[in-house]
Every structure is written in C-alpha cells, then in structure tokens.
Amino acid sequence: MNIDRFLQETIRKHMTLEDALPTKMPEYVNSFGYFFGTATLSSLAVIFISGIILAFWGPDWWHFTSVGHFTNSVHFWAVEVFYVSVTLHFTFKFFKAAWRDGRWRTWINGWLIWGISIFSGISGTLLQANWDSQWNAQQGKDAFNALGLSFMNWMNYTTVLTLHVVFFAFLIAVLVVAHLTFVRNESPVRPIVNEGKDEK
Ligand code: HEM
C-alpha cells in the first residue's frame, strides 16, 4: 500500500480545494448565529496557546510570578468564553436542526467534543494545587471508583496534569479538526424555510 496515494485519493474524493479553503459562503451564513462556532474556535485557540505557556515552565510557577498569574487568568477566562460560546453554538445548531442532510457526523462529533471538554475542564480545576482542588479530587475519586475507573487516580497530581495537558487536549484537538473537516466537506446546512422549494 502507498500511504501518500491513499491520502491523495481520499482527500480528492471528499474535498475540493474550494471546499477546504472557501473564498465564498452561501448568503445565509451572513448571520450572527455563525459567529458562535468561530468564537468557540477562537477561545479554544487561546486556551491551547496559554495552556502551552503554562505547561512550559512547570506545574506551579503560575502561583508565584506575575506573568504566571496573568497567563493563568487568560487560560481561565478563555475557558469561560469557550463554554458560553459552545453552549450558544450548539443551541443555535439545535434550532437550525443542523444535523439534516447527512450532517449527523458533525452533530455526534460535536457532542463528543463537548463531553470530553467537561472532563478536560474538571481535570483543569484539580490543577489549582490548593485545598479546594484537593477536596474536589478526594470527593470525585469515589464516583470514578464506582464506575470501575479506579485506575484513573484523580488524587495524583501528575496523573491529572498528564490527563489534562496531553490526553484530553489531544482528543479535543483531533476531534475539532474532524469537526471542521466535516463542516468543510458538507458545507453549511440550508435554512429550514427553503427546504424543498428549489426543487419544485
Ligand atoms: C470545541 C468545540 C467546537 C468547535 C470549535 C466548533 C466549531 C465549529 C465551527 C467553526 C463551525 C462552522 C461555523 C458554524 O456553523 O458556526 C461548526 C459547525 C457545526 N457545529 Fe460545531 N464546534 C464545536 C462544538 C460543537 C458541538 C458541541 C455541537 C453540537 C452538539 C456542534 C455542532 C455543529 C454542527 C451540527 C455544525 C454544522 C452546522 C451547519 O452545517 O450549518 N459543534 N462548528
């Protein structure tokens, strides 16, 4: 098997260059509702950039340096913006019934990202390294033990740090790339009011 040929054929089969890097959009995309997906994506970019800076200088420097405090706050507030945007995003997509015409993959993939982002957020709060986070980790571990997931030790700071900065971050990045690929491949769903009218 030739991997490059396989990739070439798969990309060519599913996406043109205009799909991948569109220069035009349907008129109905000129609506404020479409801003929420972009806002989610932008806040995620800020989360990743500030998170990489936080992780770069070790697990606690953000508690005792002014640059660390600032970066930590940027990371925290980007997460707040992310959750507000993603909630508005999927609410808008729900009222547009954006899963229509085979877009169920984007819809299911979106819920997967959302579910993983909850675990990512929880693991983030456990990295505060204070009494509050220790209390939460201690209380939360019983729920995981009850689910048979006791191998995930939420009381171990290093495990939680790795889960947060490697495991969940990687899953979210991969699923977001898939999300955007599906959107580019399928194009934005048509408004409900116009459905079927063009064919008559
Ligand atoms: C990290 C989280 C997410 C990011 C970065 C993201 C980003 C985007 C972007 C940029 C678009 C294209 C622009 C737009 O239509 O607004 C889009 C479309 C879409 N998203 Fe998301 N999204 C996320 C989570 C979700 C969730 C949780 C759902 C629902 C459960 C969802 C469902 C959809 C659907 C169905 C579309 C296609 C809309 C259409 O065809 O018009 N997304 N997303």
Per-region residue spans from a language model:
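Membrane-embedded alpha-helical bundles that constitute the cytochrome b-like, heme-associated redox core
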Residues: 1-200
